[in-house]
Amino acid sequence: MGFITKAIPLALAAASVINGAEILETRAGVQTLADKYIVVMNDGMTDKDFDSHRSWVNRTHRRRLVRRGAKAMTGMKHTYRFPTGMKGYSGHFDEQMINEIAKRADVKYIERDARVQINAIEMQDNVPSWGLARVGSKEPGGTTYYYDSSAGQGVTAYVIDTGTDIKHEEFSGRATWGGNFVDDIDMDCNGHGTHVSGTVAGTKFGVAKKANVVGVKVLDCDGSGSNSGVIMGMEFATNDAKKKGAGKAVANMSLGGAFSQASNDAAAAIAQGGVFLAVAAGNDNVDAAMASPASEPSICTVAASTEQDGKASFSNYGQVVDVYAPGDGITSAKPGGGSQVLSGTSMASPHVAGLAAYLIGTGKSGGPQLCDTIKNMAIDVITNPGAGTTGKLINNGSGK
C-alpha cells in the first residue's frame, strides 16, 4: 500500500495519508481512546453523498465482522451534520477499517478520539464573589453590579458542560435540559455545569439574569468526556439555535483538551452558524494555541483574571486569547441549591458568554462578530497577561 506525505496542522504530529485523507496523530502524552476515531468529510459534501458514504461504512464494517472477525468493534456511533456544512462521524473501528475509510476521496481527515475535561481547578464553599461587580465597573474592588434591566431577556445560552440543575432557584424556570451525549444520567452529577450556568444567567450570580439556559451534557460525573461526544453536543446546540434564531443564541464551553482539528472545526461550525461561542483558554499556564477548542480563531477564547486584575497563575495565555474575565474564586450555583466557589478559566468563560447574551439583549448584533464588540468594550488593565497576550478585561459598558 502506497503512502505519501502532505502538510498537516502544525499542532499535530506527522501521520499516514492515503489518497488525500490525512490520518492525524495527536501529540505524545494525550489520552486517546483505543480504536475510536472521528472522521470529517470534505467541505461542501451533499447530504445525499454523505448518506451514501455512511451506508458504505456500515456495509463494509458488517462484512468485516462476519468475514474477518474484526474484534468487537462497534462501528459508527455518532453522526455530525452542522447546518453550515461540516459533516462527519465517530466510531469504533480497527486499523484495517480505518485504512479503508482513509482511501475514500470524500474524506478530509481522520483523527483519533481523545479525552477532554473541565477547566476548573479548586473549590471552596460559601465565600464572597467579586466577578460580577468587576464586569460592571471600570475599577476593581467594587461590590455592586451595574447592568441594563434588559439583562439578556429573549436570549438562549447553551452551556455545553456536565449538565445543568434546571430546577435550581437561580434559574427561576428559565433553564431547560437540552441533551445528554456522554452517559445515561440526565442530571449534573458533577456540579461544574450548574456553576457555569449560574455565572451566565443566574438570578443572583449571573451576568445575563433574564437569559434562558439550555443544559447540554457532554462530560460525566468526573468531569470527563471525549472529543466525539463534545462534538455531538456542539452539533445539537448549533441545530437547536438555528431553530430558535441563532442571532439570539450564545454558547459556552468551559472544557478542553489537547489540540484537536475536529474539535476546532466543530467550534468554527458553531460560529459559522451565527452562534457566539465563548471557550475557556485552559488551566495549564501554557500557550492556549496548544489546546482545543480554545485555539480555534473564529470563537472567543477567554483567560482568567484575579480580583487584583492580574493573570490567574493557572490561566493559559497567548495570541489566541481574546479577552480576560474573572476566574479566580468565583461564587455561583451548585446542584441541589445554594452555591459554591470555583476557580479556573472555566469560571472566566461564562462571564463572557453571559456578557454576550446581555449585549444581545440590549440590541447589539449577535454571532461570532460579537467577540470584536466585547474586545472593543474591554478595559486594558491586566498586569503581566503573558507573552503575546492581550491585557483587556471584559466590561459591560455600564459607565460605572
From Swiss-Prot:
It holds the Pfam family Inhibitor_I9. SUPFAM superfamilies: Protease propeptides/inhibitors, Subtilisin-like. Glycans are attached at N252, N396. The keyword Electron transport does not apply. Residues 21-119 form a propeptide. GO terms for cellular component: extracellular region. Residues 1-20 form the signal peptide. Keywords: Glycoprotein, Hydrolase, Protease, Secreted, Serine protease, Signal, Virulence, Zymogen. Secreted subtilisin-like serine protease with keratinolytic activity that contributes to pathogenicity. This is Subtilisin-like protease 7. It comes from Arthroderma gypseum (strain ATCC MYA-4604 / CBS 118893) (Microsporum gypseum).
